Amino acid sequence: MAGLTVRDPAVDRSLRSVFVGNIPYEATEEQLKDIFSEVGPVVSFRLVYDRETGKPKGYGFCEYQDQETALSAMRNLNGREFSGRALRVDNAASEKNKEELKSLGTGAPVIESPYGETISPEDAPESISKAVASLPPEQMFELMKQMKLCVQNSPQEARNMLLQNPQLAYALLQAQVVMRIVDPEIALKILHRQTNIPTLIAGNPQPVHGAGPGSGSNVSMNQQNPQAPQAQSLGGMHVNGAPPLMQASMQGGVPAPGQIPAAVTGPGPGSLAPGGGMQAQVGMPGSGPVSMERGQVPMQDPRAAMQRGSLPANVPTPRGLLGDAPNDPRGGTLLSVTGEVEPRGYLGPPHQGPPMHHVPGHESRGPPPHELRGGPLPEPRPLMAEPRGPMLDQRGPPLDGRGGRDPRGIDARGMEARAMEARGLDARGLEARAMEARAMEARAMEARAMEARAMEVRGMEARGMDTRGPVPGPRGPIPSGMQGPSPINMGAVVPQGSRQVPVMQGTGLQGASIQGGSQPGGFSPGQNQVTPQDHEKAALIMQVLQLTADQIAMLPPEQRQSILILKEQIQKSTGAP
């Protein structure tokens, strides 16, 4: 026995025990103990029972005091008949009895790995997907809900847990795909994208899950990190199938509404729209109503190709609000920009009207301005942009010329004297309220309305025109086709049929000097309610004001004469040199 004590207790016990199989189910441990006592004293006899049913499994273990007795039992009792069955007595340590040996040695059930069976890395994704797919919808939803709470209440612990158990993070992402919280393509990008997971997750895990119904938790952990970076690259990525809202906030790095001011100053985290310059603004609108100052800046940015400085009076702005005229898919009309913004809910509400939309409307109505005018025409775009800036401004409380100076020099309220002065033009004639008329409203801009107005105004509206800036006008005769709904009709494009420059209609702008007695729809400076015609006029005036001497010289004689007359009238009425 001295030698036995040196050995491991479990090994020693196994050597002193025998495995007994093929035991009748009705047999008791006492009956079996009596049988095995025939070869020597029995220390213990244990039947193995099923854990779930509690019924005997048909085998057990008999422990003797020494190994010799155990060997004797195997020789003499193997095949012994009991209740019609031949007992099988074997070495407890034999290969086929390992499971029973473990139970015997430890005296406790075998502990299964909490991670389940071992799987090779390449097979892990498929295995996890199957496991997730096997979950009933209710359980999957509950899992997401619990994970979301975990992330919200203990972000750091949740982060560590997911980092330590990547298979769980993958399973959560897979579950989101199954629940349609995340688009499969986005999920793939997230998986294969290097992101600063710790920072993103730790920072604010909840935003992403919010996207999903009950999920979110996993999204925050797995996707969230990737999503923020992805948003910019993906642009349209709907994280989580996601709620475009999430994307909007994440995409383009567009910050919360409050942050818009910063966005306005710069080009915008990421231009979401193809337009380019304009796009920056589009992203900004996400913020919601913007104060006049902000509104002005955005408008300017697009025209200046995102540059904040005021445009030099002598430098033509080749690109429209949207960016490069030729490349701009939208045709460089404000509408495209507006269209982009509208989804975010930015431009619409603040404008109180279709200010930006008016251009969009045009877009749908006719070919992009570029097409109508031809190569040179893109330049007129800036004209549109100009009116637009002021219009946006109008959304907020009117700003005085100083506070609201647009790069264009347009005052938030309208063409206030100071804004005009910035351009070297006296804006007194164009009063802020005229601008308030929200000339920006797209509907007012309709080409047809404009044509009609242009006809009425003929030379009278010339007054409203100011030589505001070097906005390039049509380089050559404007095609009569331009009269159409083309957004650019407003300024440079004057239908030949209605030779009067539609721009002239701008007289509607109520500058005291600008009002045209014949102008229908003209309103007093004090008027707060603006009619579409007023908007139209304001926009036209803006365009005309931007024509340079060279551009005017390129116009047909009648149009050129009308514009010159307008300029003279404006100068006289405003006292400008």
Swiss-Prot record:
The modification Omega-N-methylarginine is found at residues 308, 468, 475. Sequence repeats lie at residues 410-414, 415-419, 420-424, 425-429, 430-434, 435-439, 440-444, 445-449, 450-454, 455-459, 460-464, 465-469. One of its GO terms (biological process) is mRNA 3'-end processing. Residues 410-469 are annotated as: 12 X 5 AA tandem repeats of M-E-A-R-[AG]. It holds the Pfam family CSTF2_hinge. Residues 108-248 are annotated as: Interactions with CSTF3 and SYMPK. Residues 360-373 have a biased composition (Basic and acidic residues). GO terms for molecular function: mRNA binding. It comes from the Eukaryota. It is found in: Nucleus. Keywords: Isopeptide bond, Methylation, mRNA processing, Nucleus, Phosphoprotein, Repeat, RNA-binding, Ubl conjugation. There is a cross-link at residue 189 (Glycyl lysine isopeptide (Lys-Gly) (interchain with G-Cter in SUMO2)). The modification Phosphoserine is found at residues 14, 518, 524. Residues 16-94 form the RRM domain. Residues 514-577 are annotated as: Interaction with RPO2TC1. GO terms for cellular component: cleavage body; mRNA cleavage and polyadenylation specificity factor complex; nucleus. Residues 207-230, 319-409, 509-532 are annotated as: Disordered. The CSTF complex is composed of CSTF1 (50 kDa subunit), CSTF2 (64 kDa subunit) and CSTF3 (77 kDa subunit). CSTF2 directly interacts with CSTF3, SYMPK and RPO2TC1. Interacts with HSF1 in heat-stressed cells. Interacts with CPSF2, CPSF3 and FIP1L1. Interacts with DDX1. One of the multiple factors required for polyadenylation and 3'-end cleavage of mammalian pre-mRNAs. This subunit is directly involved in the binding to pre-mRNAs. PANTHER family: CLEAVAGE STIMULATION FACTOR SUBUNIT 2. This is Cleavage stimulation factor subunit 2. It comes from Pongo abelii (Sumatran orangutan).
